[in-house]
Swiss-Prot record:
Gene Ontology cellular component terms for the protein in this record: chloroplast thylakoid membrane; photosystem I
Homology family: Belongs to the PsaA/PsaB family.
Binding positions for [4Fe-4S] cluster per the UniProt entry: 573, 582
SUPFAM superfamilies per the UniProt record, alphabetical: Photosystem I subunits PsaA/PsaB (SSF81558)
Organism: Hordeum vulgare (Barley)
Positions annotated to bind phylloquinone: 692
The protein, known as: Photosystem I P700 chlorophyll a apoprotein A1
Gene Ontology MF terms in the entry: 4 iron, 4 sulfur cluster binding; chlorophyll binding; electron transfer activity; magnesium ion binding; oxidoreductase activity
Length: 750
């Protein structure tokens, strides 16, 4: 038994009125920095103002003050999120065809934006069905609202107003907890209390309340909707909540109330807490009763998890003990010291959170189509494509952010003198081995994955299809992926005897699900084409990781620049007289990593878009014959680079290129404009700073001649500013181009 000294009691301590509220301060740009507060001498001032406004580390070195600023900023962020949500719900209430869509979701498209007739813009209001003209939306809000049990635009109005109230509340909380009652540092560092509250409160009670809402409101309302009852005839949510007999008509066990729960006769609740698997054939979404069951189960798990950590009662886990006990035979001191790192460096903490949240977001992208959670989501191809693309991009950005903050931690917060032989130290000591091996893997993957395509292009050009890698010639079947698919397809009755169907139709085995003559989902076959593009995914992901990881591991020092830590997180070069030392800062690795993240995600969303159009999405005739959008051409066309260019990019761009004069013409303009934004980025990425400074000086000379020179001297962008502007426009242009290409295509053919 471990004897430990009694822990200090956890008390919530705040400082009263620590910082006075001052509008004068607010109105003075750069008030947080002595240099910036003086005002501009040159145009560089405005860049530094933007770079440092939210870099709280540069305002003060006091961890408590930094923590309070971050905490307060989080409330501001939540306020903006509530405002945005309120806007979404308001559009649904004021400008949408939600009620019409609800009555006939298979023939009417979702729209929540009607363009005013100014200079002919009303051409954008396409016919979405049911006599409504507007812009077709692909956000999935209609499907989400239906799943929540929202049946009228009035309910959307009320929710929008509620969200505004919460936005105001959050704004107030941000001010209050910085200016009136600011928590002490000890409060921010009390990880056990934080874990208990977040796990039991946010996740546990949050899931429980959602499960309760689903059982008492969503399930009965969706039951009526699925049966074709007019939304106006359906009882209102509060009637279901207050009147148990109403629910008992749909689910008889409701008449017994909580008795089965306390008598452990839980199977009585199996009417509305199911374990079916698969999709509801009426809506093409997961069974809402499965989803309610899932949230109830998750709630129980998190409520238990929220009681595991030791606070004032002397029982439970201590995070520090867990981390320090975490060592194996080959890991030296293991995680000793990690507790101190994560409670004093918010960059280290944020880095872990971003990495996990980014990975989770990408997992969400893959589940939204394979297990579509909301009714009529699976047959809304535009929304399916948008949700996948959106979650992939977001996940990519979050993971790059994880590397960025890990590197900032290394430069600003890592103290090498106190770390010896723990896991982080051991990783840093053999970083050369890690990076050189990773580099070898990248070279191997790059040559081999691309080489397979080049081989196919060459054989195709020489007219030798029998010598190509394809399903009909030299097969490279993804046998491991097919094995995983098969395990999951055969799980019901074998490894998961309680389930009636497998978790997802995509595994195989089952029949397809079609709603209103459109395919919702079917078993997805994998072949040589998928094997090839999968290895391109492996290649681009490994290169992204190589760049980002090198940036983190060499953030403080390298053979080239041993004192890199003294130069900071971002610097252009190691000073004059040190040639070949540009683009070595940790910031530059993030900059370069962003381009490879963009490459990686682009290939993923292209693969998804084409694969789904070729092998999944389409129509089904009365005889049961499925006609896919691109007729199953993925397997034979995507095995050459030429096929990707000709049969995917070029063939599917026809809708966006020919969109002029139609309701999709805005996408044509965006396609053009975003290409322009992307090209504009190259001007910054390939620029020579001196060239612009010379040009500026001759323009300033002309202004002086005419006596119209400004007091603030113009300066060319610094090297890092130029790169920042360049990568921003590169990503913005590239993503918006892809967005216009995808949506014009899928709205036209889907």
């Amino acid at each position: 038994m471990i004897i430990r000294s009694p822990e200090p009691e956890v008390k919530i301590v705040v400082d009263r009125d620590p910082v006075k509220t001052s509008f004068e301060e607010w109105a003075r740009p750069g008030h947080f920095s002595r240099t910036l507060a003086k005002g501009p001498d040159t145009t560089t001032w405005i860049w530094n103002l933007h770079a440092d406004a939210h870099d709280f580390d540069s305002h003060t070195g006091d961890l408590e003050e930094i923590s309070r600023k971050v905490f307060s900023a989080h409330f501001g962020q939540l306020s903006i999120i509530f405002l945005w949500l309120s806007g979404m719900y308001f559009h649904g209430a004021r400008f949408s065809n939600y009620e019409a869509w609800l009555s006939d979701p298979t023939h009417i498209g979702p729209s929540a934006q009607v363009v005013w007739p100014i200079v002919g813009q009303e051409i954008l209001n396409g016919d979405v069905g049911g006599g409504f003209r507007g812009i077709q939306i692909t956000s999935g809000f209609f499907q989400l609202w239906r799943a929540s049990g929202i049946t009228s635009e009035l309910q959307l109005y009320c929710t929008a107003i509620g969200a505004l109230v919460f936005a105001a509340l959050m704004l107030f909380a941000g001010w209050f907890h910085y200016h009136k009652a600011a928590p002490k540092l000890a409060w921010f560092q009390d990880v056990e209390s934080m874990l208990n509250h977040h796990l039991a409160g946010l996740l546990g009670l949050g899931s429980l309340s959602w499960a309760g809402h689903q059982i008492h409101v969503s399930l009965p309302i969706n039951q009526f909707l699925d049966a074709g009852v007019d939304p106006k005839e359906i009882p209102l949510p509060h009637e279901f909540i207050l009147n148990r007999d109403l629910l008992a008509q749909l689910y008889p066990s409701f008449a017994e109330g909580a008795t089965p729960f306390f008598t452990l006769n839980w199977s009585k609740y199996a009417e509305f807490l199911t374990f079916r698997g698969g999709l509801d054939p009426v809506t093409g979404g997961l069974w809402l009763t499965d989803i309610a069951h899932h949230h109830l189960a998750i709630a129980i798990l998190f409520l238990i998890a929220g009681h595991m950590y030791r606070t004032n009662w002397g029982i439970g886990h201590g995070l520090k003990d867990i981390l320090e006990a975490h060592k194996g035979p080959f890991t030296g001191q293991g995680h000793k010291g990690l507790y101190e790192i994560l409670t004093t460096s918010w960059h280290a903490q944020l880095s872990l959170n971003l990495a996990m949240l980014g990975s989770t977001t990408i997992v969400v992208a893959h589940h939204m189509y394979s297990m579509p959670p909301y009714p009529y989501l699976a047959t809304d191809y535009g929304t399916q494509l948008s949700l996948f693309t959106h979650h992939m991009w977001i996940g990519g950005f979050l993971i790059v952010g994880a590397a960025a903050h890990a590197a900032i931690f290394m430069v600003r917060d890592y103290d090498p003198t106190t770390r010896y032989n723990d896991l982080l130290d051991r990783v840093l000591r053999h970083r050369d081995a890690i990076i050189s091996h990773l580099n070898w893997v990248c070279i191997f993957l790059g040559f081999h994955s691309f080489g397979l395509y080049i081989h196919n292009d060459t054989m195709s050009a020489l007219g030798r299809p029998q010598d190509m890698f394809s399903d009909t010639a030299i097969q490279l079947q993804p046998i491991f992926a097919q094995w995983v698919q098969n395990i999951h397809a055969t799980a019901p009755g074998v490894t998961a005897p309680g389930a009636t169907t497998s978790t997802s139709l995509t595994w195989g085995g089952g029949e397809l699900v079609a709603v209103g003559g459109k395919v919702a989902l079917l078993p997805i076959p994998l072949g040589t084409a998928d094997f090839l593009v999968h290895h391109i995914h492996a290649f681009t992901i490994h290169v992204t990781v190589l760049i980002l990881l090198k940036g983190v591991l060499f953030a403080r020092s390298s053979r080239l620049i041993p004192d890199k830590a003294n130069l900071g997180f971002r610097f252009p070069c190691d000073g004059p007289g040190r040639g070949g030392t540009c683009q070595v800062s940790a910031w530059d690795h993030v900059f370069l990593g962003l381009f490879w993240m963009y490459n990686a995600i682009s290939v993923v969303i292209f693969h998804f878009s084409w694969k789904m159009q070729s092998d999944v999405w389409g129509t089904i005739s009365d005889q049961g014959v499925v006609t896919h959008i691109t007729g199953g051409n993925f397997a034979q066309s995507s095995i050459t680079i030429n096929g990707w260019l000709r049969d995917f990019l070029w063939a599917q761009a026809s809708q966006v290129i020919q969109s002029y004069g139609s309701s999709l013409s805005a996408y044509g303009l965006f396609f053009l404009g975003a290409h322009f934004v992307w090209a504009f980025s190259l001007m910054f990425l390939f620029s020579g700073r001196g060239y612009w400074q010379e040009l500026i000086e001759s323009i300033v000379w002309a202004h002086n001649k005419l006596k119209v020179a400004p007091a603030t001297q113009p300066r060319a962008l610094s090297i890092i500013q130029g790169r920042a502007v360049g990568v921003t426009h590169y990503l913005l242009g590239g993503i918006a181009t892809t967005w216009a290409f995808f949506l014009a295509r899928i709205i036209a053919v889907g």
